[in-house]
């Protein structure tokens, strides 16, 4: 009779021992960056990192300088903190750094989607065609129509729309942007009321998933939470299924073109459903939170609100509703609103905190701007965290923690693009969308929908904080590195539709 308990116990001890030994054996080689493995075998600094990534990196930067390698859960990450040294990493002309490998593992875990060879190229090709330039006009019009539907209702404003209403600003922004974005990308039926109800249900489930997302990525969920994540994944796959899409019209060409490529490659419908879930997350996970910060900053800075409204009146004229049922805005006018552009760029500088990751494909040399050369080890992950190293650098952005609506404007009122560090012009003065091969392919659509929503709110609505003295809330530290930050608590505000002739 085989005693499986002792056998499995010995096997487990052997595996854990091997993993710990691997961490203990790693030593810094000549010319490699400073190595900080932490005090816990294999785990290294993982728990401290996950608790508050920003504070951890500040500490490591102060201890080791502009480049260092840390152990996080058995994996070694080399962080480069000098933005003047980002160029070779982001250009990577010889393709010695791989973004796709890490991304494919992440989307499989989070969305259940198993990437096909060429997916990254396919997504960028479709995005270039439909989310930039002339191809973006169709989607922008759909977004305006759906913002009208979500914000004004299927029959236009109700008789009491001009009465004050109260809500949480974060929920309000996230809810509206998500529903309008979802309907613009995945289409509608003939029943607008039902479309809104379904979009509302999808958003409620999306928020449940969203709240667990950081701990899900780090595998820190409890047993019941793992079950809940599995349930939510199945629900999204069903609600976004290609089968259900047959009942809808107005699905964006961006989505239909990519699904057509997947079908031609023989991808099963069930996997296409998971692809749709991934696209929903990629397109809607950050826009709502970003507009929350934008409107909050405008509400806390009356001079900024005044400047945006004056620009809107100058460019668009008086705000009006078409047939009293939808917003009448020429979306192309957004291209002539540098003050609004600066507000959004400043909001992204303060609120967007993604981590850029590249897998080191082979041992190689990284030359820093200082001239110092460091050896990178095959299998390690090279990481950039621009929020700390760029957005919060007082040399690049004086008073970096302060919201300045005109930070990205020249004295003449045009867009400011010249920023400097140590007297040298810096190309990457903000990086909210990532950069290089991993730059967000949908950034132009995302920026348009955010600007459009903010514009509609400040021109068609009166809005004010319930408590004018309420401070800007601190961010939720668990979300560092995952795109746009979210507040640690809600902010209450009031709004009402302005009467129009």
Swiss-Prot record:
EC number(s) from the headed UniProt entry: 1.14.14.139
Catalysed reactions, semicolon-separated: 7alpha-hydroxycholest-4-en-3-one + reduced [NADPH--hemoprotein reductase] + O2 = 7alpha,12alpha-dihydroxycholest-4-en-3-one + oxidized [NADPH--hemoprotein reductase] + H2O + H(+); 5beta-cholestane-3alpha,7alpha-diol + reduced [NADPH--hemoprotein reductase] + O2 = 5beta-cholestane-3alpha,7alpha,12alpha-triol + oxidized [NADPH--hemoprotein reductase] + H2O + H(+); chenodeoxycholate + reduced [NADPH--hemoprotein reductase] + O2 = cholate + oxidized [NADPH--hemoprotein reductase] + H2O + H(+)
GO biological process: bile acid biosynthetic process; positive regulation of intestinal cholesterol absorption; steroid biosynthetic process
A molecular-function term among this protein's GO annotations: sterol 12-alpha-hydroxylase activity
Residues the entry annotates as binding heme: 440
Ranges that cross the membrane: 1-21
Membrane topology reported for the UniProt record: Single-pass membrane protein
Compartmental location: Endoplasmic reticulum membrane; Microsome membrane
Origin superkingdom: Eukaryota
Modification Phosphoserine occurs at: 326
Listed pathway(s): Lipid metabolism; bile acid biosynthesis
InterPro entries listed in its UniProt record: Cyt_P450 (IPR001128), Cyt_P450_CYP7A1-type (IPR024204), Cyt_P450_E_grp-IV (IPR002403), Cyt_P450_sf (IPR036396), Cytochrome_CYP8B1 (IPR030686)
SUPFAM superfamilies in UniProt: Cytochrome P450
Cofactor(s) the record lists: heme
GO cellular component term of the entry, any: endoplasmic reticulum membrane
Keyword set, alphabetical order: Endoplasmic reticulum, Heme, Iron, Lipid biosynthesis, Lipid metabolism, Membrane, Metal-binding, Microsome, Monooxygenase, Oxidoreductase, Phosphoprotein, Steroid biosynthesis, Transmembrane, Transmembrane helix
PANTHER family with a match to the protein in the record: 7-ALPHA-HYDROXYCHOLEST-4-EN-3-ONE 12-ALPHA-HYDROXYLASE, PTHR24306
General function of this protein: A cytochrome P450 monooxygenase involved in primary bile acid biosynthesis. Catalyzes the 12alpha-hydroxylation of 7alpha-hydroxy-4-cholesten-3-one, an intermediate metabolite in cholic acid biosynthesis. Controls biliary balance of cholic acid and chenodeoxycholic acid, ultimately regulating the intestinal absorption of dietary lipids. Mechanistically, uses molecular oxygen inserting one oxygen atom into a substrate, and reducing the second into a water molecule, with two electrons provided by NADPH via cytochrome P450 reductase (CPR; NADPH--hemoprotein reductase).
Recorded family membership: Belongs to the cytochrome P450 family.
Name the UniProt record assigns to this protein: 5-beta-cholestane-3-alpha,7-alpha-diol 12-alpha-hydroxylase
Organism from which the protein derives: Sus scrofa
High-level lineage: Eukaryota, Metazoa, Chordata, Craniata, Vertebrata
């Amino acid at each position: 009779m085989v005693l499986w308990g002792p056998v499995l116990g010995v096997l487990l001890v052997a595996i854990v021992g091997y993993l710990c030994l691997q961490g203990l054996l790693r030593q810094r080689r000549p010319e490699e960056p400073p190595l900080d493995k932490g005090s816990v075998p294999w785990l290294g600094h993982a728990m401290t990192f996950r608790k508050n990534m920003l504070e951890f990196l500040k500490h490591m930067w102060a201890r080791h300088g502009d480049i260092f390698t840390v152990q996080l859960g058995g994996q070694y990450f080399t962080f480069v903190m000098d933005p003047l040294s980002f160029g070779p990493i982001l250009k990577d002309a010889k393709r010695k750094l791989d973004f796709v490998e890490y991304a494919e593992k992440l989307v499989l875990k989070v969305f259940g989607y198993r990437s096909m060879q060429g997916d990254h190229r396919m997504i960028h090709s479709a995005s270039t065609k439909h989310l930039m330039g002339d191809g973006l006009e169709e989607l922008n019009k759909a977004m305006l129509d759906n913002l009208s539907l979500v914000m004004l209702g299927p029959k236009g404003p109700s008789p009491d729309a001009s009465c004050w209403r109260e809500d949480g600003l974060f929920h309000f922004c996230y809810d509206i942007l998500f529903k309008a974005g979802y309907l613009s990308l995945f289409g509608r039926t003939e029943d607008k009321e039902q479309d809104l109800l379904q979009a509302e249900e999808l958003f409620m489930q999306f928020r449940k998933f969203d709240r667990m997302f950081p701990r899900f990525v780090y595998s820190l969920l409890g047993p019941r939470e793992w079950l809940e994540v599995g349930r939510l994944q199945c629900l999204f796959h069903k609600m976004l299924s290609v089968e259900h899409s047959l009942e809808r019209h107005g699905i964006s060409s961006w989505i239909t073109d990519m699904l057509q490529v997947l079908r031609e490659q023989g991808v099963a419908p069930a996997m296409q459903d998971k692809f749709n879930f991934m696209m929903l997350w990629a397109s809607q996970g950050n826009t709502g939170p970003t507009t929350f910060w934008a409107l909050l900053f405008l509400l806390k800075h009356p001079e900024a609100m005044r400047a945006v409204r004056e620009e809107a009146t100058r460019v668009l004229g008086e705000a009006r509703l078409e047939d009293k049922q939808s917003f009448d805005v020429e979306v192309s006018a957004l291209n002539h609103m540098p003050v609004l552009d600066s507000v959004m760029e400043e909001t992204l500088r303060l609120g967007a905190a993604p981590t850029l990751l590249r897998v080191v494909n082979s041992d190689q040399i990284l030359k820093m701007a200082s001239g110092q050369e460091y050896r990178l080890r095959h299998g390690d992950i090279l990481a950039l965290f621009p929020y700390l190293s760029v957005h919060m650098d007082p040399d690049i952005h004086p008073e970096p923690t302060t919201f300045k609506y005109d930070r990205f404007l020249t004295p003449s009122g045009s867009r400011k693009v010249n920023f400097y560090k140590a007297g040298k012009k810096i190309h990457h003065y903000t990086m909210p969308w990532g950069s290089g091969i991993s730059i967000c392919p949908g950034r132009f659509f995302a920026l348009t929908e955010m600007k459009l929503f903010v514009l509609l709110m400040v021109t068609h609505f009166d809005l004010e904080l319930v408590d004018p003295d309420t401070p800007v809330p601190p961010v939720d530290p668990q979300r560092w590195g995952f795109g746009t930050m979210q507040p640690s608590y809600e902010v209450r505000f009031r709004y009402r539709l302005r009467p129009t002739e």
